[in-house]
Amino acid sequence: MARPRNKADLIVAATENFEKLVKMIEEMSDEEKAKDFDFSGDEKKQEAHWGRDKNVRDVLIHLWEWHKLLLQKKKNNRDLKNVKIQFLEEGYSWKTYGAMNKVFWERNQEVLESDALELVKKSHSEVMELLEGFSEAELFEKDVFDWVGGSVLGSYFVSTTSSHYDWAMKKLKAHKKLVLGK
């Protein structure tokens, strides 16, 4: 699916990708869920996240933490037009956000997979509700919110929803392929 460039396409992509992701998780066997992710034998999977996430819970928690970033920033800055704020957690930049992702992973190791799924379902609904409240112009025209930098607000929603869900599905498919030996 192409990257959404308008509100209607974003809503469809986020909704469809989330539903596919949840279905994929619900259809995973106990064996697939129980076995730790191990992509160390694949030279193509060298990015940090391939080594960081060890199971379905870790993937779900990653999505949930990024939902929280978006929800928190927008709740606190809904009416801010000419103010620059930090989107990422304090102390991190777009060059160092990998370290932030590692912190997300570390602080959620005690969360159960079932709880992680409920957390991400709830936060997805909240993100979609937040998304609905923005106009097409607020989402996809530049210079509406200074805090998004040279980007548009819609790109934050795309990255936090449809694109992130696609990333999660690719990771789960790769794990499933390894477990099943296909």
Language model features with spans:
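Short, intrinsically disordered/low-complexity patches at protein termini
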Residues: Q46, V83-I85, S93-K95, L139-E141, ...
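Short, helix-capping/interhelical loops that line the mouth of catalytic, cofactor-
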Residues: M1-A13, Q46, K68-L119, K177-K182
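A generic secondary-structure boundary signal that marks alpha-helix termini
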Residues: K23, D30, K68-Q72, D79, ...
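Short, solvent-exposed segments of well-ordered alpha helices
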Residues: R5-A8, V12, Q46-W50, K54-R57, ...
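Alpha-helical transition-metal enzyme core signature, strongest for iron centers
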Residues: A14-L21, I25, V56-K74, S93-G98, ...
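Long amphipathic alpha-helical segments
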Residues: A137-F140, W167-L178
